[in-house]
Regions:
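Flavin (primarily FAD) cofactor-binding/catalytic cores of flavoenzymes
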Residues: 2-44, 68-200, 206, 219-383, ...
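Conserved N-terminal glycine-rich FAD pyrophosphate-binding loop of Rossmann-like flavoproteins
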Residues: 39-63, 202-218
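Polar, surface-exposed loop/tail segments
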Residues: 382-392
Length: 434
């Protein structure tokens, strides 16, 4: 490797993905450094309000015997910190070091941080798909006075108790919106309205998210080699029956579920129990003025607060390469990666987790991918430049990576090993670290 670099690998982001990649870089004998812009590890979880939690079961979030005491924000932060403590990673993490510019100079990556420049031969951008809260553009008068209508993104609602007695308008059709509906109902909002353009599939259930969010049944379908079309048909039939049983036919998504494209979200029990009380509007928010919200249908509403459950975007503007800087969504980013992780727009650049869609084990997924990225850097694996054009869930990822990384996926630890693990592991037990 070039003598002009300081490190074999730099990793932008000290969240779960970044720390796992640091661990596997060290296991591979690479000199690696994590650059984290915040004052501590944890990524986005460090900034989220305490009520935020995961929407998969605990066993699918963590891996090995790394501790996870619960699904909430504080417990998730503690689990992420446990990677630092268990594997003595702290000396490889540079905090308060946001990257303002990333440029490949033809020989290595140069990363500008507040106190200088870090150079590395390879770069992992472990910034996730939740870099920046997304709020759609709406019309506002140029000379608008202060609006009576308060606006909060889901990440900015610090205390849901403040919703008590308020007229609430929730905007969005995915997991963040479902959470906001649930919180509004739980904390006594006077009236709850819901605006959505399109709806994502979710699993109607009375079970908590951390129970309903288990992906193990789906993994077993893969392990039994059930064809994708049949998997989709089985899941679609089950979901439609659940929607009918809960009286939710009015919000059936317009398309049949396709696990190559869709994320499967667990339902929120309180939202389902009070579904009839939620005033629903299909459309978008077009304008917000001094005291009202106008929808694309022409309806004019007067809520006290608008809660934006519109998710997050990807912020890559620190990249010097214009094609990268222009990417703003996880879907765009995934389409610009070959072999799941490898950037098509820059040399020696990797984006972990772009195919992770909530139907898989989070830490395990990152660990499997990190191991192969390190093998590629060391020259024992080959990440090709062919985009996948679909989500790769769990065992699909093993099928894709195994022939490209024979050193990690040996005859003893290849497809059959992970198939047997999927079928044999107790549902409440995390998968072992690879």
């Amino acid at each position: 490797m070039s003598s002009q670099k300081d490190f074999d690998l730099a990793i932008i982001g000290g969240g779960l993905a970044g720390l796992i990649h640091l661990h596997y870089a060290r296991k591979a004998g690479l000199n690696a450094l994590v650059l984290e812009g915040r004052s501590g590890v944890g990524g986005l979880w460090r900034e989220l309000p305490a009520w935020q939690d995961i929407q998969i079961c605990l066993a699918d979030w963590t891996a090995g015997d790394l501790p996870l005491a619960g699904p909430g924000q504080a417990q998730i932060l503690a689990n992420i910190q446990s990677w630092v403590d268990r594997f003595a990673l702290s000396d490889g993490i540079r905090l308060d070091s946001p990257v303002s510019k990333a440029k490949h100079n033809g020989d290595c990556w140069e990363l500008d941080i507040p106190n200088g420049t870090v150079r590395a031969r390879h770069l992992v951008a472990a910034i996730g798909g939740h870099s920046k809260p997304f709020i759609p553009d709406v019309k506002r008068p140029d000379t608008q006075p202060s609006s009576r209508v308060r606006e909060l993104h889901s990440s900015a609602l610090r205390d849901p108790a403040e919703l008590k007695g308020l007229d609430v308008l929730v905007v969005g059709g995915g997991a963040s919106a479902f959470d906001l509906l649930d919180q509004s109902l739980a904390h006594g909002a006077r009236h709850v309205r819901w605006v959505y353009r399109h709806l994502r599939w979710f699993t109607p259930t009375t079970k908590p998210k951390v129970v309903a969010g288990s992906f193990r049944p789906y993994g077993k379908m893969q392990a039994h080699d059930i064809p994708v079309a049949q998997q989709n048909a089985l899941i679609d039939a089950d979901l439609r029956a659940r929607y009918a049983r809960f009286g939710l036919d009015a919000i059936l998504p317009e398309h049949s579920i396709d696990m190559r494209r869709d994320q499967l979200i667990p339902g929120r029990a309180r939202m389902l129990a009070h579904f009839a009380e939620i005033e629903r509007h299909q459309g978008t928010v077009e304008a917000i003025d001094a005291d009202s919200v106008t929808l694309s249908s022409g309806a004019r509403l007067t809520p006290d607060v608008v809660l934006w459950g519109t998710g997050y975007g990807t912020d890559l503007r620190f990249f010097d390469e214009p094609k990268l800087a222009a990417i703003s969504t996880l879907h765009e980013l995934a389409s610009r990666c070959g072999c799941i992780f490898r950037s098509l727009d820059a040399t020696d650049l990797y984006f972990p987790g772009v195919g992770l869609d909530g139907v898989g084990a989070t830490s395990w997924f990152y660990a499997i991918g990190a191991r192969t990225i390190m093998s590629h850097i060391r020259g024992t694996a080959k990440l090709d430049m062919e985009p996948v054009h679909r989500k790769l869930n769990h065992l699909d990822m093993i099928r894709h990576l195994a022939p490209r990384d024979p050193g990690s996926f040996t005859p003893e630890t290849g497809w059959e090993f992970y198939r047997d693990m999927t079928l044999g592991q107790a549902d409440d037990q995390p998968y072992p670290l690879p």
